[in-house]
Amino acid sequence: GRSALKPEASQMVLKRWGFKRTNFVLANTIERLGPYKEQLSAENQEWQKKAYVPPDDAHNRYFEVDTALAYLDAFISQVREAYGKLELFGPEHCEPNSYESLDYEGRVLVLSPDTLKESCWTPQNQLWLAHDGFGCSPHAVGRSIRCTCLGDGEQTRWNRTDFTGVLKEEFLPGWAREKLEEFQGQNAGMGGMEMT
């Protein structure tokens, strides 16, 4: 049948190669299928459209999966399901056009999973409160943003390009809201910070 692929197939590959490499190879494979990609599920085709594969025919041909399309489709679905279980924040959780048009100062930002090591892929490591820096402005020459991780309180600087965008208020988890209130209390003498 269509789902004859054992569940542990993707688990073994992900354990050895990780999501970043596996996702690249799968997206590249779909890209190189040409018209045959229409035989994959609509969800897997849609997933591939969101993945970036650098145009490099000379080298990309070495990063393909050579298997029956039914197995490829089932494998991609397994990998997508495993990724979904991580419950990471993505563009769908962010304000539209954040990077191009929004000021980040005082806002909760979503750090892109591409910026983090896979061992740090948790929602707690993705949410950061932006304090200041030229990178807060979408039109500034500087890109640096001083911010605090809502998960563990670490303060550091990231570049504007490291973030997916500004988190929409409705996706702010309770634990993050508590941290923001904590920060607001600590900074009340300095004018406070916005929660949105």
Model-predicted segments: where are they?
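Gram-negative host-targeted secretion-system effectors, predominantly Type III and Type IV
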Residues: G1-T196
